[in-house]
From Swiss-Prot:
Pfam families: LpxC. It catalyses: a UDP-3-O-[(3R)-3-hydroxyacyl]-N-acetyl-alpha-D-glucosamine + H2O = a UDP-3-O-[(3R)-3-hydroxyacyl]-alpha-D-glucosamine + acetate. This is UDP-3-O-acyl-N-acetylglucosamine deacetylase. Its cofactor is Zn(2+). The gene is lpxC. Zn(2+) binds at H78, H237, D241. It comes from Pseudomonas fluorescens (strain SBW25). It is an enzyme of class 3 (hydrolase).
Length: 303
C-alpha cells in the first residue's frame, strides 16, 4: 500500500518575508492522518489555522496567499512545492508572521528541512486525485489545463520579450516518473526585473527581495554574480510554483498540468474549476504500490 506521510521530527528555521522584509520563525511539525498541510499563525492569540486548500486562496497578485477571515499567510507556494515533491501529506506549518520566509527564493531549503526532519509513513492509504478528462481555463492569451496522464507531469511555457529570455529556453516539460523534483526543479529560484523591484519597494512590497533570494534581471542581463543554477531556471521556477499551487487540491495528482504564461491566479482558477466538475476527476488509493503510476522515494531517515 502507498501510505500517507508526515514528518518524523519537528524542525525549525528562520528567514525573512519577501514582501514584508520581516524576520519570520518557521516550525514544521508532524500531523495525524488526513490532516493535510495546515498553516498556523502562532503569533496570534488565539492561534489561527488555515488549511492549504484551493478554496482558502485569497490574493494571487505576487504570490499565493491563504486566508481565514482577516488572517492571511503569504507566499505559500515554494514550501508547498517541497511538500508535494517529497510526498508529505500531513504537516503543521507554524509561522511567527503573515508570510512564509523566502529563504533563497527556491524550494531547495525547504526540501533540506523536510529531509532533515525525516519522513514517516502513516497507517492509512495515500489519496491521489486522478484527472479523467481535460479541464482548461483561459485569460486573454494565458492558459492553464489539466489532461489525463498516467503519472505526474508538468509542462510550462513562458513568453518574455527580453534579451535574457529570448536567448534561453522558455518551455519545459517534466515527467516526474523519470525526473527528480529535488535535483531538477527544487533549486530553481524566483525571478524579477530590477525596474519592477524598484516599483514594488515604493509600494512597500519586495522589501526582503535581493540577489540572495531571487534572480534579478536588468536591461543588460542577470545581476546575480553566480549566474543561473539551471540553463532553463526561469521556466523551471514556474514549474516549481505550479507544483506548489496544484498541491492546494489537498492530494497528489495523477495527470498532467500544462501552463502557457500562467501564474498563481490562473492556477487557482483551474483548481476551482476542476473541483466543481466532479466528473473530471476521482480519488484513488493503491493497495499495491507496484500498480501505481507514481512512486515516491523511500522515507529518508532523519539527518
Amino acid at each position: 500500500m502507498i501510505k500517507q506521510r508526515t514528518l518524523k521530527n519537528i524542525i525549525r528555521a528562520t528567514g525573512v518575508g519577501l514582501h514584508s522584509g520581516e524576520k519570520v520563525y518557521l516550525t514544521l511539525k508532524p500531523a495525524p492522518v488526513d490532516t493535510g498541510i495546515v498553516f498556523v499563525r502562532a503569533d496570534l492569540d488565539p492561534v489561527v489555522q488555515i488549511p492549504a486548500r484551493a478554496e482558502n486562496v485569497g490574493e494571487t497578485t505576487m504570490s499565493t496567499t491563504l486566508v481565514n477571515g482577516d488572517v492571511k499567510v503569504d507566499t505559500v507556494e515554494h514550501l508547498l512545492s517541497a511538500m508535494a515533491g517529497l510526498g508529505i501529506d500531513n504537516a503543521y506549518v507554524e509561522l511567527s508572521a503573515s508570510e512564509v520566509p523566502i529563504m533563497d527564493g527556491s524550494a531547495g531549503p525547504f526540501v533540506f528541512l523536510i529531509q532533515s526532519a525525516g519522513l514517516e509513513e502513516q497507517d492509512a492509504a495515500k489519496k491521489f486525485i486522478r484527472i479523467l478528462r481535460e479541464v482548461t481555463v483561459e485569460d486573454g492569451d494565458k492558459r492553464a489545463t489539466f489532461v489525463p496522464f498516467e503519472g505526474f507531469k508538468v509542462s510550462f511555457e513562458i513568453d518574455f520579450d527580453h534579451p535574457v529570455f529570448r536567448d534561453r529556453t522558455q518551455s519545459a516539460s517534466v515527467d516526474f516518473s523519470s525526473t527528480s523534483f529535488v535535483k531538477e526543479v527544487s533549486r530553481a529560484r524566483t525571478f524579477g526585473f530590477m525596474s519592477d523591484i524598484e516599483y514594488l519597494r515604493k509600494h512597500n512590497l519586495a522589501l526582503g527581495g535581493s540577489v540572495e533570494n531571487a534572480i534579478v534581471v536588468d536591461a543588460d542581463g542577470v545581476l546575480n554574480e553566480d549566474g543561473l543554477r539551471y540553463e532553463d531556471e526561469f521556466v523551471k521556477h514556474k514549474i516549481l510554483d505550479a507544483i506548489g499551487d496544484l498541491y492546494l487540491l489537498g492530494n497528489s495528482l495523477i495527470g498532467e498540468f500544462k501552463g502557457f504564461k500562467s501564474g498563481h491566479a490562473l492556477n487557482n482558477q483551474l483548481l476551482r474549476k476542476l473541483i466543481e466538475q466532479t466528473d473530471a476527476w476521482e480519488v484513488v488509493t493503491f493497495e499495491d504500490a507496484s500498480t501505481a503510476p507514481i512512486s515516491y522515494m523511500r522515507p529518508v531517515a532523519a539527518v
